[in-house]
Curated annotation (Swiss-Prot):
<keyword id="KW-0677">Repeat</keyword>
<keyword id="KW-0175">Coiled coil</keyword>
<dbReference type="GO" id="GO:0005739">
    <property type="term" value="C:mitochondrion"/>
</dbReference>
<keyword id="KW-0744">Spermatogenesis</keyword>
<feature type="modified residue" description="Phosphoserine">
    <location>
        <position position="173"/>
    </location>
</feature>
<keyword id="KW-0597">Phosphoprotein</keyword>
<feature type="coiled-coil region">
    <location>
        <begin position="88"/>
        <end position="150"/>
    </location>
</feature>
<feature type="repeat" description="TPR 5">
    <location>
        <begin position="375"/>
        <end position="408"/>
    </location>
</feature>
<dbReference type="GO" id="GO:0007018">
    <property type="term" value="P:microtubule-based movement"/>
</dbReference>
<dbReference type="GO" id="GO:0019894">
    <property type="term" value="F:kinesin binding"/>
</dbReference>
<dbReference type="Pfam" id="PF13374">
    <property type="entry name" value="TPR_10"/>
</dbReference>
<keyword id="KW-0496">Mitochondrion</keyword>
<feature type="region of interest" description="Disordered">
    <location>
        <begin position="157"/>
        <end position="193"/>
    </location>
</feature>
<keyword id="KW-0221">Differentiation</keyword>
<keyword id="KW-0206">Cytoskeleton</keyword>
<keyword id="KW-0505">Motor protein</keyword>
<feature type="region of interest" description="Disordered">
    <location>
        <begin position="1"/>
        <end position="20"/>
    </location>
</feature>
Length: 505
């Protein structure tokens, strides 16, 4: 007797392949059926065993034994099917566990891949910062070498210049272009009244004492005294002469410059606008004093970073000075320098080169190649070339500056020293200029390759040009004029009426 259990649901008919879950469910049903069938067969086997024990030797004994053997075989088949079903269920559970583990490992692999991508990005960022740090270190080393070179050049500065405090490095400053116009126009003997006379208008004698006191207090940093003094004088002038008077405009200009030194740029701007309006009404729109006020206002806007507003003011001041003084006047060249620097801060390098070239031609035509303003303007133009990555043009200008300073002074140059002093200085310069040329060449190449025209490099380049321009100056003249020049330079630097020290602090 053979017992077979058919799988429910038409298993094995080849209609469709069941899913693993369906196979497990059907296998569990088959297991339940086999267990019930096993219990039934065990009951039959028990009854047959009892019947065989109760009957003796008889004719039906063989039939009972045959039945018992069939039931035993059926039980063995049922046990085998149950064992295989249990194995199948265990295998299914194991496969499920493996699938879950597989999904877990896949999720972990995705997470590790994401972490790997993050680590790669972080590594790339770290490498980028490392390269930037290495470049910064290299740039700082080049700047250090350049500053050490500039420090070596200071030994050639005259005593009066070396005693003046160094201003901190700053961005391109409009004040670095040239000193006060009145100081250069009338010389040291008249600098005490530098801001007193503006564009042909002379301050009355009663205001000069007050003006000098304001200069003195402002130079000492005693603004709490200088400001009330200016305001009191301004009120007295308005009561006696009215608001629209040139004296009032002059006092407004002085008060504006005091506010400027206190970094009160808004108040200074308002006062300069008022002074400009008064001067235009009383002196005319094309008076040199109007040009000076326009220039002061433009420089003040430049200190506040408002270069676009400062440019038309500076342009108008240039037009006035060209019309009144002529196109080849030194003040026109100074105004061109200011306008070029404003354009440079706006990235208008074509206009910068044009303005500097024109200023350079004016200085060379008036003072020749040995004019200190030629070196300053060439240095400014070289700085503009550096900002445009025009390294070759910048290097040529720097070499021209050094070559001019290395040449002996022309025959017409003033010389108040003795012959022995002159010969000694000439020998000293000739023995050191070969080293200076080599040092400045290395410094310029490093400057070209790394500094790329930063503000500090521009200021340092200006100081270098100024230092080198003093190499041909007779040292015997320094002690005589040391104190007056320093005192008057401080006064004019504090309260200039045109362009002095209006750069960012």
């Amino acid at each position: 007797m053979s017992v077979q259990v058919a799988a429910p649901g038409g298993l094995g008919l080849g209609l469709e392949r069941p899913s693993p879950e369906e196979l497990v469910r059907q296998t569990r049903q088959v297991v339940k059926g086999l267990e019930a069938l096993r219990a039934e067969h065990r009951g039959l086997a028990g009854h047959l065993a009892e019947a065989l024990a109760a009957q003796g030797p008889a004719a039906g004994l063989e039939l009972l034994e045959e039945k018992q053997q069939v039931v035993s075989h059926s039980l063995e088949a049922i046990e085998l099917g149950l064992g295989e079903a249990q194995v199948l269920l265990a295998l299914s559970a194991h496969v499920g566990a493996l699938e879950a583990e597989k999904q877990r490992l896949r999720a972990q692999a995705r997470r590790l891949a994401q972490e790997n991508a993050w680590l790669r990005e972080e590594l790339e960022e770290t490498q980028r910062r490392l390269r930037a740090s290495e470049e910064a270190v290299a740039q700082l080393e080049e700047e250090k070498s350049h500053l050490e070179f500039l420090g070596q050049l200071r030994q050639y500065d005259p005593p009066a210049e070396s005693q003046q405090p160094e201003s901190p490095p700053r961005r391109d400053s409009l004040a670095s272009l040239f000193p006060s116009e009145e100081e250069e126009r009338r010389g040291p003997e008249a600098v005490g009244a530098a801001a007193a006379q503006q564009g042909g208008y002379e301050i009355p004698a009663r205001l000069r004492t007050l003006h000098n006191l304001v200069i003195q207090y402002a130079g000492q940093g005693r603004y709490e005294v200088a400001v009330p003094l200016c305001r009191q004088a301004l009120e007295d002038l308005e009561r006696s002469s009215g608001h629209c008077h040139p004296d009032v405009a002059t006092m407004l200009n002085i008060l504006a410059l005091v506010y400027r030194d206190q970094n009160k740029y808004k108040e200074a701007t308002d006062l300069l606008h008022d002074a400009l309006q008064i001067r235009e009404q009383t002196l005319g729109p094309e008076h040199p004093a109007v040009a000076a006020t326009l220039n002061n206002l433009a420089v003040l806007y430049g200190k506040r970073g408002r270069y676009r507003e400062a440019e038309p003011l500076c342009q108008r001041a240039l037009e006035i000075r060209e019309k009144v003084l002529g196109a080849d006047h030194p003040d026109v060249a100074k105004q061109l320098n200011n306008l070029a620097l404003l354009c440079q801060n706006q990235g208008k390098f074509e206009e910068v080169e044009r303005h500097y070239a024109r200023a350079l031609s004016i200085y060379e035509a008036l003072g020749g190649p040995h004019d200190p303003n030629v070196a300053k303007t060439k240095n400014n133009l070289a700085s503009a070339y550096l900002k445009q990555n025009k390294y070759q043009q910048a290097e040529e200008l720097y070499k021209e500056i050094l070559h001019r300073e290395a040449l002996p002074a022309p025959l017409g140059a003033p010389n108040t020293g003795t012959t022995s002093d002159t010969q000694q200085q000439t020998l000293s310069r000739s023995s050191s200029f070969s080293k200076l040329r080599e040092s400045i060449r290395r410094g310029s190449e490093k400057l070209v390759s790394r500094l790329r025209g930063e503000g500090a490099a521009g200021a340092a380049g200006m100081k270098r040009a100024m230092s080198l321009s003093m190499l041909n100056t007779d040292g015997s003249r320094a002690p005589e004029n040391q104190f007056p020049r320093q005192h008057l330079s401080e006064a004019s630097r504090t309260l200039s009426t045109s362009t002095q020290d209006l750069g960012p602090r």
